[in-house]
């Protein structure tokens, strides 16, 4: 089987992505019923490169490999020659001789692409400044579990046109739903990514207008990692874009609220929104584990029924 990478949602076909979502749900249900008895990754090793720290990403990938009988290696810039200037391609070629699959959480998407181009083993994007596709697998899985098929439905992104927003746009293309992106002027997502999605994506600047009749509402922090010095300015610019219980009241009666976490209560969301019955953020966070199990299984073993 040819080496497949998962750098954005566009690296898999819509049919493959739909299979992954259903497979993740099956894996989750099997774990609840039988415990971690399915171990297809025996003697397999995942190398995890972290330039950006994370709670959910590290724990979910390490646990996924442990449940499936494999092993995960944590590598920070201090642990590798990349931190001392070794070319990215050289590191990729070396690691491919030793491990079965690689996960990278970094700043530069171009650097990730350079690594994948030189790698003979699958590479997973666990977050770059441009995309966060693993989170979208968990998000669509959660939406599907809670509300059924997402095809033809309407999701709303409120906030910065950042890496999460870009992946939501790609998800609208691949899973065939409509997406309204609502942000302050000047914080729109990449124009080329929006254009590629065609009529599925609409840019708005009024949160109340954006959520009218929406099936799902989601958001993210106003200042991402590396943007801390912009926090004060962003708080001013995003005033009026906080997602609250009252804002959700203008969406569909059965609206679902998601947040990739960590959340800054009192900033992009009200202090109590995560506890609202319309929010499914804890289920969403837990689904990172199951969605990534399905992803690693697909990249190493192909389609498993």
UniProtKB/Swiss-Prot annotation:
Residues that hold L-ornithine according to the record: 163, 220, 224-225
One GO CC term on file: cytoplasm
GO BP terms in the entry: arginine biosynthetic process via ornithine; citrulline biosynthetic process; L-arginine biosynthetic process
Residues bound to carbamoyl phosphate: 54-57, 81, 105, 132-135, 260-261, 288
Reaction(s) the record says it catalyses: carbamoyl phosphate + L-ornithine = L-citrulline + phosphate + H(+)
Presence of keyword Amino-acid biosynthesis: yes
Enzyme class: transferase
GO MF annotations in UniProt: amino acid binding; ornithine carbamoyltransferase activity
Keywords: Amino-acid biosynthesis, Arginine biosynthesis, Cytoplasm, Transferase
Main location: cytoplasm
E.C. code: 2.1.3.3
Presence of the UniProt keyword DNA damage in the record: no
Disulfide cross-links: none
Lineage: superkingdom: Bacteria
Subcellular location: Cytoplasm
Entry coiled-coil feature ranges: none
Pathway: Amino-acid biosynthesis; L-arginine biosynthesis; L-arginine from L-ornithine and carbamoyl phosphate: step 1/3
Function: Reversibly catalyzes the transfer of the carbamoyl group from carbamoyl phosphate (CP) to the N(epsilon) atom of ornithine (ORN) to produce L-citrulline.
Record PANTHER family: ORNITHINE CARBAMOYLTRANSFERASE, MITOCHONDRIAL, ORNITHINE TRANSCARBAMYLASE, MITOCHONDRIAL
Family, similarity comment: Belongs to the aspartate/ornithine carbamoyltransferase superfamily. OTCase family.
Protein name: Ornithine carbamoyltransferase
Gene (UniProt): argF
């Amino acid at each position: 089987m040819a080496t497949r990478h998962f750098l954005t949602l566009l690296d898999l076909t819509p049919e493959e992505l739909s299979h992954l979502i259903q497979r993740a749900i099956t894996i989750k249900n099997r774990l609840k019923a039988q415990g971690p008895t399915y171990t297809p990754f025996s003697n397999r090793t995942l190398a995890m490169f972290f330039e950006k720290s994370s709670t959910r990403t590290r724990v979910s990938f390490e646990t996924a490999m442990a449940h499936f009988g494999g092993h995960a290696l944590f590598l920070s810039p201090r642990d590798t020659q990349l931190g001392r200037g070794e070319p990215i391609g050289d590191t990729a070629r070396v690691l491919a001789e030793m491990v079965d699959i690689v996960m990278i959480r970094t700043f530069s998407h171009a650097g990730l692409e350079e690594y994948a181009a030189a790698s003979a083993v699958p590479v997973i994007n666990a977050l770059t400044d441009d995309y966060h596709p693993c989170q979208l697998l968990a998000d669509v899985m959660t939406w599907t579990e809670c509300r059924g098929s997402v095809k033809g439905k309407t999701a709303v992104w409120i906030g910065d046109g950042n890496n999460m927003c870009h992946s939501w746009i790609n998800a609208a293309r691949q899973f065939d739903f409509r997406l309204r992106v609502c942000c302050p002027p000047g914080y729109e997502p990449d124009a080329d990514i929006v254009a590629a999605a065609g009529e599925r994506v609409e840019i708005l600047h009024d949160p109340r207008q954006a959520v009218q009749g929406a099936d799902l509402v989601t958001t993210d922090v106003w200042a991402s990692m590396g943007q801390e010095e912009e926090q004060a300015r962003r708080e001013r610019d995003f005033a009026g874009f906080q997602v609250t219980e009252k804002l959700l009241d203008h969406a569909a009666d059965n609206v679902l609220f998601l947040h990739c976490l960590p959340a800054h209560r009192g900033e992009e969301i009200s202090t109590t929104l995560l506890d609202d019955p319309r929010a499914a953020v804890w289920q969403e966070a837990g689904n990172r584990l199951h969605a990534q199990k399905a992803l690693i299984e697909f990249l190493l073993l192909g389609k498993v029924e």
